[in-house]
């Protein structure tokens, strides 16, 4: 299950509106395909990117903060592939986060469960 929350609040002194968008429990749903024949599109980080891009365009990039609450490294074929199959290339997860423009990403319990080898590659 993917969680998306949007908060808006006012900052005093010079009035400014900051939009905070958070994701969490993505569990490897980086792309909108489930890799199973006959299944349609699903909610993914690419869906979130489309929303965040439109929000950044509407209110200004500097007024949007994008955060992830962890649990991104397990649960999908793409995550499994980069965790355990193709371990000779840079892990895809940091590149996905950079592509989306995340401001901060924290580690969840399922991210640690992948093991030290995976965790070290993600942090390299």
Q: Residues of each region from the PLM?
A:
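N-terminal catalytic scaffold of extracellular/periplasmic and nuclease hydrolases
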Residues: 12-124
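Generic low-polarity alpha-helical segments
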Residues: 2-3, 37
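Accessible peptide chain termini
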Residues: 1-2, 50
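C-terminal segment of classical bacterial N-terminal signal peptides
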Residues: 3-11
């Amino acid at each position: 299950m993917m969680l998306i929350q949007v908060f808006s609040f006012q900052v005093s002194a010079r009035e400014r509106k900051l939009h905070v968008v958070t994701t969490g429990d993505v569990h490897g749903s980086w792309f909108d395909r489930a890799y199973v024949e006959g299944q349609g599109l699903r909610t993914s980080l690419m869906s979130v990117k489309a929303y965040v891009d439109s929000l950044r365009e509407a209110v200004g990039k500097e007024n949007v903060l994008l955060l992830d609450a962890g649990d991104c490294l397990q649960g999908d074929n793409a995550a499994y592939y980069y965790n355990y199959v193709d371990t000779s290339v840079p892990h895809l997860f940091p590149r996905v986060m950079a592509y989306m423009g995340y401001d901060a990403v924290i580690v969840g319990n399922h991210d640690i469960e992948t093991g030290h080898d995976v965790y070290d590659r993600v942090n390299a």
